[in-house]
């Protein structure tokens, strides 16, 4: 299990995913109000002029999408760091046990 975590960690470190979202993720909220004509046609004429443009600007100004993408990248890396630390601690304990066995054998001679 720890070897798998180390391999995943190395792959993530070598193939860094950009911190900014992919442009297609940015296009979805912007195009959403324009692609639903039923919601636009049900509004009053004054709302139709300001409705889609206002919702488009609000969705673009919202940092929610950027935060969600960054968190989804940070959480696995944080978990992998914890797994890496646990693997290092286990390896250090195993090495200490091996060293103790070697010293015990040398001391018996």
Curated annotation (Swiss-Prot):
* UniProt feature, compositional bias: Low complexity: 33-50
Give any single GO term for biological process: response to immobilization stress
Q: Where is the composition biased (Polar residues)?
A: 51-60
Span list, region Disordered:
24-60
Q: Which UniProt keywords apply?
A: Amidation, Glycoprotein, Hormone, Secreted, Signal
**One of the record's GO cellular component terms:** extracellular space
Which residues would be cut away as propeptide? Answer: 23-67
**Where does this polypeptide localize?**
Secreted
**Valine amide modifications at:** 106
Q: Which residues form the signal peptide?
A: 1-22
| Primary localization class, coarse | secreted
Molecular-function GO terms, alphabetical: corticotropin-releasing hormone receptor 2 binding; corticotropin-releasing hormone receptor binding; G protein-coupled receptor binding; hormone activity; hormone binding
Explain the post-translational modification.
Glycosylated.
Q: Which domain of life is it from?
A: Eukaryota
> What is its quaternary makeup?
Binds with high affinity to CRF receptors 2-alpha and 2-beta.
Q: Hey, which family's this protein in?
A: Belongs to the sauvagine/corticotropin-releasing factor/urotensin I family.
Q: What PANTHER family does the annotation carry?
A: UROCORTIN-2, UROCORTIN-2 AND 3
Write the protein's name: Urocortin-2
Organism for this UniProt entry:
Rattus norvegicus (Rat)
């Amino acid at each position: 299990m720890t070897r798998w975590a180390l391999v995943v960690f190395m792959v993530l470190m070598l193939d860094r995913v950009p911190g900014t979202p992919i442009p297609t993720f940015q296009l979805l909220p912007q195009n959403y109000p324009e692609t639903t004509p039923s919601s636009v046609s049900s509004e009053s004429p004054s709302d139709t002029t300001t409705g889609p443009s206002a919702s488009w600007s609000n969705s673009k100004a919202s940092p929610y999408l950027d935060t969600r993408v960054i968190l989804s990248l940070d959480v696995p890396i944080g978990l992998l760091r914890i797994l890496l630390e646990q693997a290092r601690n286990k390896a250090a304990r195993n090495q200490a046990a091996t060293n103790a066995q070697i010293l015990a054998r040398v001391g018996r001679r």
